[in-house]
């Protein structure tokens, strides 16, 4: 009886040690694009809660308020979003994605999808075999076809819809990160 109990305790502790090792070895990256600063605030809280590295996706030409005027069909964002194959240039940054197991990717929702600069980011690096969890901020629309459209830019990654984080506080973000 004691030998069975000893084996059970040994197996239990070995399983717990493996869990801890996988958590330690699992490296996360929070990558984000933020035109107005709202998504950036959420990304910083997520990175802190997840103990993850932070990577800002920056356009070579920053967006102005006029560029973001979705009511103007000739504004930069309206034009970009009407042509799905458009890829805005981003500031190039050296980044070895092979060091990350999980990418938490954030952006504002534009026209029910991610801004096309997110496609630029996904096509610029190799995300083969990576888990990509999305988060977004939005003035009213949800994820829509976001996962489907982004999957085309990273076909060998596993992309999942995460959460809309409109007005989320540190506690809510921390709870969400723990659930990942």
Question: What kind of feature is each model-predicted range?
Answer:
Residues 133-169:
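Short, glycine-/small-residue-rich phosphate/pyrophosphate-handling segment
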Residues 50-52, 130, 157:
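A structural micro-motif
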Residues 107-108:
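Glycine-rich, N-terminal phosphate-binding loop of Rossmann-like dinucleotide-binding domains
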Residues 10, 15-102, 112-114, 119, ...:
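N-terminal beta1-alpha1-beta2 submodule of the flavodoxin-like/Rossmannoid cofactor-binding fold
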Residues 111-112, 140:
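Acidic catalytic loop of the alpha/beta-hydrolase fold
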Residues 97-98, 123-129, 153-154:
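Short, conserved loop/helix-junction motifs that constitute active-site signature segments
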């Amino acid at each position: 009886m004691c030998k069975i109990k000893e084996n059970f305790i040994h197996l239990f502790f070995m399983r717990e040690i493996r869990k801890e090792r996988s958590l330690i070895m699992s490296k996360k990256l929070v990558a984000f694009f933020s035109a107005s600063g709202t998504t950036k605030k959420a990304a910083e809280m997520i990175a802190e809660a997840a103990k993850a590295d932070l990577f800002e996706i920056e356009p070579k030409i920053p967006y102005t308020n006029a560029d973001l005027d979705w009511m103007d069909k000739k504004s930069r964002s309206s034009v970009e979003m009407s042509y799905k194959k458009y890829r805005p240039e981003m500031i190039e940054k050296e980044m070895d994605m092979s060091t990350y197991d999980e990418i938490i990717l954030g952006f504002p929702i534009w026209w029910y999808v991610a801004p096309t600069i997110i496609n630029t980011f996904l096509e610029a690096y190799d995300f083969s075999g990576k888990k990509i969890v999305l988060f977004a901020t939005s003035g009213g629309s949800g994820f829509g076809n976001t996962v489907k459209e982004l999957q085309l830019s990273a076909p060998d990654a596993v992309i999942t819809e995460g959460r809309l984080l409109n007005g989320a506080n540190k506690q809510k973000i921390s709870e969400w990160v723990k659930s990942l």
